[in-house]
């Protein structure tokens, strides 16, 4: 989701456990870079960046349980 002036919100597509966070705030990312690794029903699901930019904010940490639609990170320009 892109909110004008706020960056691109990377959201979880399902209820899952956060296994790993692969990026940090202020880190530069490219399209296809792995941002977060989720686990649901014994399957690992990598969350990839859909745009290039700088990580403005990471909203989750390993061990967190996220809901569908929950914001994982925000990517700025």
Predicted segments with their positions:
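Short histidine-centered loop motifs in beta-beta connectors
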Residues: 13, 20-24, 28, 57-60
């Amino acid at each position: 989701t892109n909110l004008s002036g706020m960056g691109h919100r990377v959201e979880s597509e399902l209820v899952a456990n956060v296994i790993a966070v692969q990026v940090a705030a202020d880190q530069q990312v490219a399209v296809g870079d792995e941002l977060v690794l989720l686990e649901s029903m014994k399957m690992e699901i990598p969350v990839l960046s859909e745009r290039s930019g700088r990580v403005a904010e990471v909203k989750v940490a390993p061990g967190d349980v996220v809901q569908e639609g929950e914001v994982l990170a925000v990517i700025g320009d």
